[in-house]
């Protein structure tokens, strides 16, 4: 499972001209699901992402988490995070989970976020969405459970 997490001042997602999710200060999480992902990866990634302390304290040090700043979460499904650009000029997306598994684990990730105390605003799996955000910093992190859960700490 892969996530691109951005610290934002605000973010929203629009489908067919209607804003379906909107947040103030917090995290915009673009979420991609791989074919071997399970509910275990969902929970791990939700805990890791929502626990990050990447907001600045009074000394300008990244030391505060969502809870300390009253932050919100917007999650948008993004199968293109599994795009393979090794050959040619058009990406292949065969490394992404199929729609059934992708949607199930996307919904599970949303539920895990809510269970951790951060009920997310969100887009709709498989929809054509317009995402707007005002980045804060910018601070953007790439989280990949294949690396986070399986590699020894350096």
What name fits each language-model region?
Residues 131-144:
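C-terminal edge-of-domain segments
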Residues 18-70, 83-111, 115-116, 121:
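Compact, glycine-rich, soluble single-domain proteins
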């Amino acid at each position: 499972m892969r996530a691109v997490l951005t610290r934002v001042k605000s973010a929203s997602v629009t489908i067919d001209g209607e804003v379906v999710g909107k947040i103030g200060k917090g995290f915009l999480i673009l979420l991609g699901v791989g074919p071997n992902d399970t509910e275990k990866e969902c929970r791990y990634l939700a805990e890791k992402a929502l626990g990050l302390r990447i907001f600045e304290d009074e000394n300008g040090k990244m030391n505060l988490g969502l809870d300390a700043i009253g932050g919100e979460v917007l999650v948008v499904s993004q199968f293109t995070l599994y795009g393979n650009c090794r050959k040619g000029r058009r990406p292949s997306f065969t490394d992404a989970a199929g729609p059934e598994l992708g949607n199930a684990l996307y919904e599970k990730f949303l539920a895990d976020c809510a269970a951790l105390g951060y009920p997310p605003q969100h887009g709709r799996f498989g929809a054509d969405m317009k995402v707007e955000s005002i980045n804060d910093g910018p601070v953007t992190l790439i989280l990949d459970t294949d690396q986070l859960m399986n590699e020894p700490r350096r």
